[in-house]
């Protein structure tokens, strides 16, 4: 009994027993033996549920090619639109540069030749055709700010710009238009400068939107600014008179006295309030049509088709 118990404690290894069995008889190559499928034993080291499951969906090749073509078409359309936008911006930028070059030396159009006027009108027409804001009154914020007049075909301004008798005393230094879209106000201003003073004439107006491009302007008052006198007179140390140099240094005491007097007079006059007067005649209204507008350039047309080219005060186009 003791020997039997001892043997039962160490059972025979089944793998060794299988290895000791005689091999099965060889099957001839000319015959095929079919045996029933046996279910293989699998040694499970990990639980099968710990492995994630994946699903693979098969797509027909034609369908995949169609999707690739669609995606390629969308990407191509976006790239083409970006290229077209970049190209259009370059064209507009080039047109503006050419326009500014043509305006150089024309004194706001006063000294422009007929050939220059024709070229300017052609460039203006091309810019109007590429207006990035075809409805300017719907983008009133772009109208805000001080706009400097660079060119006009309005003949009513030419006598003011070209009067020789006036230029001997005063010269037109700047013509501007300031727009406040929140208050619906327009201020037109002409600034004059002279040898010893400067002044300005201003008109204040209200405007109403009448169409996507047109506004109606009603002038309310005019203002004549108080002259700002130069408070110092600069006298050179010497001057040449009929080929002789005259020393002015002995007169510095007299000159200093004159400068003090001029400074006192200038402060007195400059401290006076401007002169205001109402505008109520039949010519107190006009309309303005904006045919081109971006963040630095504005082209407008007024009664009779007169054209105005204005540049925003902060624009590098003025430099």
From Swiss-Prot:
Superkingdom classification of source: Eukaryota
Main location: plastid
Keyword Nuclease: no
Localization per Swiss-Prot or TrEMBL: Plastid, Chromoplast
Keywords tagged on the record: Chromoplast, Plastid, Transit peptide
Record: transit peptide: 1-55
Any matching Pfam family: PAP_fibrillin
Cellular component annotations (GO), alphabetically ordered: chromoplast
Function: May be involved in carotenoid sequestration within chromoplasts.
Membership in a protein family: Belongs to the PAP/fibrillin family.
Name of the protein: Chromoplast-specific carotenoid-associated protein C2, chromoplastic
Organism, as annotated: Oncidium hybrid cultivar (Orchid)
Lineage: Eukaryota, Viridiplantae, Streptophyta, Embryophyta, Tracheophyta
Gene transcribed to yield this protein: CHRC2
């Amino acid at each position: 009994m003791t020997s039997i118990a001892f043997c039962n404690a160490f059972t025979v290894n089944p793998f060794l027993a299988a290895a000791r069995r005689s091999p099965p008889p060889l099957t001839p190559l000319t015959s095929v033996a079919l045996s029933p499928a046996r279910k293989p034993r699998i040694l499970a080291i990990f639980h099968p549920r710990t492995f994630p499951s994946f699903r693979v969906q098969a797509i027909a090749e034609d369908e995949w090619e169609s999707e690739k073509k669609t995606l390629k078409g969308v990407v191509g359309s976006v790239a083409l639109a970006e290229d077209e936008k970049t190209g259009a911006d370059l064209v507009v930028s080039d047109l503006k540069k050419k326009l500014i070059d043509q305006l150089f030396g024309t004194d706001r159009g006063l000294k422009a030749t007929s050939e220059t006027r024709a070229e300017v009108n052609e460039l203006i027409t091309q810019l109007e055709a590429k207006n990035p804001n075809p409805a300017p009154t719907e983008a009133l914020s772009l109208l805000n700010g001080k706009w400097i007049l660079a060119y006009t075909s309005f003949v009513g301004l030419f006598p003011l710009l070209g009067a020789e008798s006036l230029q001997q005393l005063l010269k037109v230094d700047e013509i501007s238009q300031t727009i406040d879209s929140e208050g619906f106000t327009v201020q037109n201003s002409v600034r004059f400068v002279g040898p010893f003073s400067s002044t300005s004439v201003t008109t204040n107006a209200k405007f109403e939107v009448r169409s996507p491009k047109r506004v109606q302007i009603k002038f309310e008052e005019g203002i004549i600014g108080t002259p700002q006198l130069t408070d110092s007179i600069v006298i050179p140390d010497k001057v040449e008179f009929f080929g002789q140099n005259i020393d002015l240094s002995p007169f510095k005491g007299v000159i200093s006295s004159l400068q003090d007097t001029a400074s006192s007079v200038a402060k007195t006059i400059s401290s006076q309030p401007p002169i205001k007067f109402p505008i109520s005649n039949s010519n107190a209204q006009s309309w303005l049509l904006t045919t081109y507008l971006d963040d630095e350039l504005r082209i407008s047309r007024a009664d009779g088709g007169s054209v105005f080219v204005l540049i925003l005060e902060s624009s590098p186009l003025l430099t």
